[in-house]
């Protein structure tokens, strides 16, 4: 049975009464159709017109519109009037008979119109009562009945189906604007068939649509919590998008158990993207699980923000308004005598809190191993720092290795995931780091790699039409630069240090374009050499081009003078000889302090000799 049949069956009772009323005491059906005036026909609903047309002998009424049915009935009226005119002389024997016939026709017309009005009022009252007492689904069925006055029955039925499908689909908060447009386009467009009826029905529909939009849109009110509700605690990272927000409960990627947060709650409590929030959601009652309108469970209570109270979070400063400075507090990476990687970095490229460093590496030069050594050194020597390792477009086995070898927060999106996941993970991770810096904490972010992040933005972002060499869109270069530019030392307290890897010599013109964009943004650079790595010498550091800007702020005056003499000696050698000499001398000492003392005693000249 189709939906058209259901609509027709739902109105059979009224249509039968109407048909019986119209055809009572009228031997000629066509004459009865003729007695109904044009005004009466325009006030009838579509099923009533079809029933009247069928009684009048009109065929094919199921596919006719309202205007076509009225025209067909008018044609039958004309035929009936013609018959009456032709038969008039034989039956009309006087003025009294004509007057009686006219009065009878007028009385019959008034009776038909009264019956139609009573039937319509009864059905309207039943619809209004059902709309008040029944749920949303009953209200939609009543709306389909009331829409019988629309010009196009097929279009009305399709609109009802679309509205029903939208209701069943639930409040997809990712498409709020589309839902609102669809809801507004499904407004009933009926004729004014009663004084005040259109206004009452319009207000009823507007109120219902307003409730729907309030439930579905991101600007909706907060979910109310009743006393008898059972709540369940939740915690996660807040991800604020355009018109809605979610608490990511399973990490930094979207998951099926994420919690929806209304925009009113976000604005009311001053929430920001990257906040670590705790709260509660309402547990669905028995039998309510299958009838939930919302795809995600909403947050009904907010307990804490970043481990503190909600009121304290409203008073925190904004990251963009904090004053950045050059790094002036050093991060010591030296750990054990046999861990030469961190010892070389301390000598060649000292790192401070708030540093923006790039590890420029060709493939298979050991950049991932260097990142692991740096991460372990930070967690061992700098316990006050919060470590975050962000792996973008990385191999799954390297993610597992990093998670097991690093005592820190590892955030990863493997290469088998879409580019949009890479960009989402990186953006949410850097926003989380900013929120920690706003609290005055020192954060260290290790990114592998900035080149792959640029590729992901190039593939995920819409084309702007300005394509650079290598197929790189010009708009895809700004988001990775914004990520790297977040590193800074804050004057008011706290710092954000970013150490990112950049790939070169990959044979890709696009990778070279991305690297050239970031080349001048960092204030420290560690360059790896593939030829040194092919000789199985690790770390494969090219000493001469590596270094740190303003390194005198990180080193003591005595240490700065000795390091300066060391760099002058190594600059006279090629890259292979320089790293070999440095590694051989480091193996002879247990600490960098001993090595620098030895250099000061054995190296002739000073930084002032020229």
UniProtKB/Swiss-Prot annotation:
Residues 118-131, 189-198, 215-227 have a biased composition (Basic and acidic residues). Residues 117-227 are annotated as: Disordered. Residues 199-214 have a biased composition (Basic residues). Pfam families: ATP-synt_ab, Rho_N, Rho_RNA_bind. SUPFAM superfamilies: Nucleic acid-binding proteins (SSF50249), P-loop containing nucleoside triphosphate hydrolases (SSF52540), Rho N-terminal domain-like (SSF68912). Belongs to the Rho family. This is Transcription termination factor Rho. InterPro entries: AAA+_ATPase, ATPase_F1/V1/A1_a/bsu_nucl-bd, CSD, NA-bd_OB-fold, P-loop_NTPase, Rho-like_N, Rho_factor_ATP-bd, Rho_N_sf. Residues 178-187 have a biased composition (Polar residues). ATP binds at residues 352-357, 364-369, 395. The gene is rho. It comes from the Bacteria. Keywords: ATP-binding, Helicase, Hydrolase, Nucleotide-binding, RNA-binding, Transcription, Transcription regulation, Transcription termination. Facilitates transcription termination by a mechanism that involves Rho binding to the nascent RNA, activation of Rho's RNA-dependent ATPase activity, and release of the mRNA from the DNA template. The keyword Membrane does not apply. Signal peptide: none annotated.
